[in-house]
Amino acid sequence: MSLSGMAIRRLITKGVIPVCQVAPLSTSAEGSTNLKEVLSKKIPAHNAKVKSFRTEHGSTVVQNVNIDMIYGGMRSMKGMVTETSVLDPEEGIRFRGYSIPECQKLLPKAKGGEEPLPEAIWWLLCTGDVPSEAQTAAITKEWNARADLPTHVVRMLDNFPDNLHPMAQFIAAIAALNNESKFAGAYARGVAKASYWEYAYEDSMDLLAKLPTVAAIIYRNLYRDGSAVSVIDPKKDWSANFSSMLGYDDPLFAELMRLYLVIHSDHEGGNVSAHTSHLVGSALSDPYLSFSAAMAGLAGPLHGLANQEVLVFLNKIVGEIGFNYTEEQLKEWVWKHLKSGQVVPGYGHAVLRKTDPRYECQREFALKHLPNDDLFKLVSTLYKITPGILLEQGKAKNPWPNVDSHSGVLLQYFGMTEMSFYTVLFGVSRALGCLSQLIWARGMGLPLERPKSHSTDGLIKLALAAKK
């Protein structure tokens, strides 16, 4: 008797089946290497499931919304459908049901590598299946073939002034790729709504193929005197080509990129960038415009600046007490920092109630490859002392480190010290999540998003009426 993928995942979670003993759970891993063909079978089956569910439970109430939720940025309000990932308060992000450690075990890796390939997480996010090596290689081959940038985008990037922020350049270049949109062309021709996802898929594959080149040109223009990016090597994977185009030929940096791009790829649908791409996409804007808008959201300091703020914090510590500190001296410094009304960046999370697994896998990478790096040792000591301090202070619901507490330190170690570029890296990664969500939104025929808004006076009337 065979177990379903979900049943096996539950057994993994409970420890009944060790992760390392589980073969890929994919129903498509033995089949086609054509992702679009696989999706053409999965989308109708999923839509039938949704139709049946809505027929039976369409009027079921799943949450009561209170006034604080409305004024509080709709935090924790159940109001979206996102199939690609779910954030568990205890286990962290799950990509199609798989935890970070499970993805690290199960997803295909580069030859000789230890970190999962972003091509594999893309297949997983799109299908819910762990891909085979052949399916992963097919994505690599397709992205390499689609990577060329149109001349007008290269010219635009080369003509941007040096003082234009890298995220502004990234956003503009993505939008400027829209003249190649297959989705926009298909809509103009009046194709059937049921086919929208196919053109969203084509645009998404094209955009993912081109993003590393866009990002690399921005980086080389701003920080490497405009030196030309290397050409795509068809023998290299997405991350290895990206690393080379940036100017980093250390194979270990490519491994870091694989890890970074996978763990930052998706985080449910309610964060600013994912929600923005969904909202703009719901108006049937093409994936280029939708993702460009998402990146404008990511550029906001409350969304995409966190790992830079951690580095500023670490450099402040080093500037005041150096690297030859004792644990007690560091405790005193953190307490002084908190008592001055400031926070410890990189600690706490809106949903998680334990150490972020994305932090833990970066820590494991550092312990293996850079255990004696001074900044990493500072991060490690902070990890040892800060949760206890925050618990004693009594203000933090979650005193544990999140993903942003570590990523900047790893990039610094390999020589990428240009902090203003870090959000662009984040954006390249987050494209995997935003665009897989967008394909499914069009495949499911999700409608234009249009929530009802109220004035404060209107809410007062509603609240008073509810109390009668």
From Swiss-Prot:
**Main enzyme class:** transferase
Q: Which GO terms describe its cellular component?
A: mitochondrial matrix; mitochondrion
What does the entry give for GO biological process? carbohydrate metabolic process; citrate metabolic process; tricarboxylic acid cycle
Compartments it resides in: Mitochondrion matrix
**What SUPFAM superfamilies does this protein map onto?**
Citrate synthase
Swiss-Prot/TrEMBL keywords: Mitochondrion, Transferase, Transit peptide, Tricarboxylic acid cycle
A Gene Ontology MF term for this entry? Answer: citrate (Si)-synthase activity
EC code: 2.3.3.16
Q: Does the keyword Transferase apply?
A: yes
Instruction: Identify which residues the record assigns to the active site.
Output: H303, H349, D404
Q: In which pathway does it act?
A: Carbohydrate metabolism; tricarboxylic acid cycle; isocitrate from oxaloacetate: step 1/2
Catalysed reactions listed for this entry: oxaloacetate + acetyl-CoA + H2O = citrate + CoA + H(+)
Checking CDD domains in the record gives: ScCit1-2_like
Name the family: Belongs to the citrate synthase family.
Question: Subunit structure of this entry?
Answer: Homodimer.
Q: What else is known?
A: Citrate synthase is found in nearly all cells capable of oxidative metabolism.
Please report the name of this protein according to its UniProt entry.
Answer: Probable citrate synthase, mitochondrial
